[in-house]
Swiss-Prot record:
Record comment regarding domains: All members of the FAM83 family of proteins share a conserved N-terminal DUF1669 (domain of unknown function 1669) domain of about 300 amino acids. This domain mediates the interaction with casein kinase 1 (CK1) isoforms. Therefore, it has been proposed to rename DUF1669 the polypeptide anchor of CK1 domain.
Biological source species: Mus musculus (Mouse)
Gene that this sequence comes from: Fam83d
Name the UniProt record assigns to this protein: Protein FAM83D
Residues annotated as transmembrane: none
Region ranges (DUF1669): 1-296
Amino acid sequence: MAARFELLDDLPAACLSPCGPPNPTELFSEARRLALEQLLAGGPDAWAAFLRRERLGRFLNADEVREVLGAAERPGEDGAAVAEDSFGSSHECSSGTYFPEQSDLEPPALELGWPSFYQGAYRGATRVEAHFQPRGAGAGGPYGCKDALRQQLRSAREVIAVVMDVFSDIDIFRDLQESCRKRGVAVYILLDQTLLPHFLDMCMDLRVHPEQEKLMTVRTITGNIYYARSGTKVVGKVHEKFTLIDGIRVATGSYSFTWTDGKLNSSNLVILSGQVVEHFDLEFRILYAQSEPISSKLLSNFQINSKFDHLADRKPQSKEPTLGNLLRMRLARLSSTPRKSNLGPEEPPKDRAKPKRPDSEASTISDEDYFHSHKDQLEDSKVADAATQTEPREEMAAVSLSEVGTQTSSSMMCVGTQTTVVTRAASSQATVWSKSTTTQTEADESFLPQGAQSKEGSPASKMSVSRSSSVRSSSSVSSQGSLASSVSSHVSLTAADLHTPAYPKYLGLGTPHLDLCLRDSFRNLSKERQVHFTGIRSRLTQMLTVLSRRTLFTEHYLSYSPGSFTRASTNLVSVRDIALYPPYQ
């Protein structure tokens, strides 16, 4: 008896039917196949004529005829060309041997994770829970299928796998999105390829891009494909509807993820748990292996139609200085002949002409005196530049100086760059004027650690804190009086050079405090230049020492004889000093 039961288990299920194995003529009909060929080639009229001639019954109704003709893809069309391209690209690494039931291509992996159930693992006793819609009034409400499905989705902890024909219900999609983002549940969605645009329209309304979800994968599947002898193929639709939850529960039935099925249409939903879920697990993995990613052509059509333009990453422009501006400012501060860095200030209005100060940029006139003497001209101007930094009056508000050396006004954009004098390089300074208040900042040691300021005991620093706004001792001479392109250029600008006939009114150099400021400025400038030249001198000395050692390397370590040529004696110190002290005519 035991052997008899084993033999019965080995037989196919069709042979155990009371009616016996199915008749092959019932599974395949050559006449119907030829009728379908006539339908694809000649249309409904040719199909009807073939049925009358062969005395066949109408095995397709009117809706099915329209669906078959709508799903037909003839060779040379856009859809067929795209399918052939995708087929060829996916089979580049495959062999040329034909195996109908096997493939040497790797199926797509479930990259988001999958429950680890080995084949034949026990998943519990099979239980069935049926839901129908609409329900009776005494059962608690008419929307049983949708409520039961959403309850199952909210209880998921590991994975949710959906196979659906059409998906356009916003509430269910939000439940899936919440499971991905808040609970970290992996979501796989397989949709019918022909009904995918409805899903993308829903994503557009919700302002969600399916490709940007980290724990959600959306792919497309199709039904069976019928190939005609003429090359035309008919792609079937997907009518499978089930949702697999954590590998232990599955919800299946006639209910689709649409608003009409949730509110209007009559449908049913069956929730299965236990060992029967293993069959749905295997079916989903088979469908996922046959699935394809969302067509790039379809996504491009949505992008061309500006349906996903709101999802583009638009980063606000940063108001902070960029790296390029910071590097240019740093180079300007360390150069011997600096230039004022340009951060792109606002251009003055065209209707207002920017007034120019009649004196030179190297002038040491007090800005307060100039302001009172040209008050009428400065009322209509926004910003003016000067090469010297003056002390603000006590009743004016001072603005702190930023680390990058940019001095701004409280009501204006930055139009000037203040580069303080450092110990290794000379720099230029610029002041910013405003219409209402003078926004010059007091250069404290906490804000300008590298600034070369006057000593506390010097007379110039004592006069700079007084009510009469004097010129600060840290004012530098403009680059007009120096050789801007030379590293070792010497600026010897004396007080006599400033007595030009063009400015007899403003250059009163006979005052004591101006003489002290000029003397202190030239003293600081000479010290900085000496330190700068000393650094260059030391680097050149080191380079010459390295070069002199390289000439003796081959003789001592490589046993190389220099030969019979005469080596000229060269004083390396003189070579070094030639670059430092060029002769001036």
